[in-house]
């Protein structure tokens, strides 16, 4: 039975912010740089946090530090506490921000990361009107450069703009659930037509691995690619978000090489002098990112934390 007179612990936001930084960056040294403190100060902060909650948050395993069960439990709450704190501050500071924010989104991001971004922006800046324009990835940079959009969400990192990683997802080979890939024959590919960064990546990956391929179906839209793959016309490569019950993942066992991860990026053109876009971009930059797909892992032998990222 829980006593009604049990004292309530008030968690220190500075301690929680450092705790999350350590978890995200994997080492005390990296976290110290992120929160502008010395490594010894970070260590002392974590000791104070353990004393405050009355639980061990870290356990040593050889050279590695691991979050304990209590540490993992606290990490989820710490993220939420900091998120609500930062959101409250941003909302009060920019509650009167008005205007029309035009966001360009690539096909890949329109039904994946974009809804989360729109929810975040509209909740913090309720007086903003949002105008969303969805086009192929290859045309996004041109739209931002011509100021047709204020910000863009894309999976292709442009060199000319500032880019904030919203999410990193695994990229897989896909075919229909009942599809049988014929070994020894060129890979039948289902791809978008040019220009397409994904198409370029797929062909470069196969060529580098000396794997023969052929174009089985070329589409002008991403829904058409999905439909063709589900119909059993061939194989494609897309981020993990494309996975559905009527598709299956192909791998090295099927003779296909690994693919690079897909980054979902929020991009801003600093040369545009667009104050509204700058405010939103900087707010997202300082906002802890809850949308990462893959768990964090520590390099072998590193003095780091092995944790699962809290995904909401």
UniProtKB/Swiss-Prot annotation:
Q: Which SUPFAM superfamilies match?
A: Periplasmic binding protein-like II, Winged helix' DNA-binding domain
Keywords on record: DNA-binding, Transcription, Transcription regulation
InterPro entries tied to this protein: LTTR, LysR_subst-bd, Tscrpt_reg_HTH_LysR, WH-like_DNA-bd_sf, WH_DNA-bd_sf
Which GO molecular function, any one, fits this protein according to its record? cis-regulatory region sequence-specific DNA binding
Gene Ontology biological process terms in this record: DNA-templated transcription; negative regulation of DNA-templated transcription; positive regulation of DNA-templated transcription; regulation of DNA-templated transcription
Which residue range or ranges hold the HTH lysR-type domain?
11-68
DNA-binding feature ranges: 28-47
| Cross-referenced CDD domains | PBP2_LrhA_like
Family statement:
Belongs to the LysR transcriptional regulatory family.
Q: Which purpose does this protein serve, as stated in its record?
A: Not known, does not seem to act on the proton translocating NADH dehydrogenase genes (nuoA-N) which are part of the lrhA operon.
Q: What is this protein called?
A: Probable HTH-type transcriptional regulator LrhA
Taxon lineage: Bacteria, Pseudomonadati, Pseudomonadota, Gammaproteobacteria, Enterobacterales
Gene of origin?
Answer: lrhA
């Amino acid at each position: 039975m829980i006593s009604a007179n049990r004292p309530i612990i008030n968690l220190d936001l500075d301690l929680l912010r450092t705790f999350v930084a350590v978890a995200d960056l994997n080492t005390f040294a990296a976290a110290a740089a992120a929160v502008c403190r010395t490594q010894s100060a970070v260590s002392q902060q974590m000791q104070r946090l353990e004393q405050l909650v009355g639980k061990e948050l870290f356990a040593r395993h050889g050279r590695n530090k691991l979050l304990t069960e209590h540490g993992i439990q606290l990490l989820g709450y710490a993220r939420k506490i900091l998120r609500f704190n930062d959101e409250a501050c941003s909302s009060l500071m920019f509650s009167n921000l008005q205007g029309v924010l035009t966001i360009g989104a690539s096909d890949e991001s329109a039904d994946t990361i974009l809804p989360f971004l729109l929810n975040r922006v509209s909740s913090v800046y309720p007086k903003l009107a949002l105008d969303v324009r969805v086009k192929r990835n290859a045309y996004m940079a041109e739209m931002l450069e011509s100021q047709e959009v204020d910000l863009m969400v894309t999976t292709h990192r442009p060199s000319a703009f500032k880019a904030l990683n919203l999410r990193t997802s695994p990229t897989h080979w896909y075919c229909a659930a009942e599809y049988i890939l014929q070994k020894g024959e060129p890979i039948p590919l289902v791809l978008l037509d040019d220009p397409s960064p994904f198409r370029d990546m797929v062909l470069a990956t196969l060529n580098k691995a000396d794997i023969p391929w052929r174009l089985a179906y070329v589409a002008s839209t991403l829904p058409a690619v999905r439909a063709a793959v589900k119909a059993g016309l061939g194989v494609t490569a897309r981020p993990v978000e494309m996975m559905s019950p009527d598709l299956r993942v192909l791998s090295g066992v099927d003779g296909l090489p690994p693919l690079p991860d897909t980054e979902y990026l929020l991009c801003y053109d600093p040369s545009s002098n667009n104050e509204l876009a700058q405010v939103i971009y900087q707010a997202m930059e300082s906002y802890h990112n809850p949308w990462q797909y893959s768990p964090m892992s520590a390099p072998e032998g590193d003095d780091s934390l092995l944790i699962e990222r809290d995904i909401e």
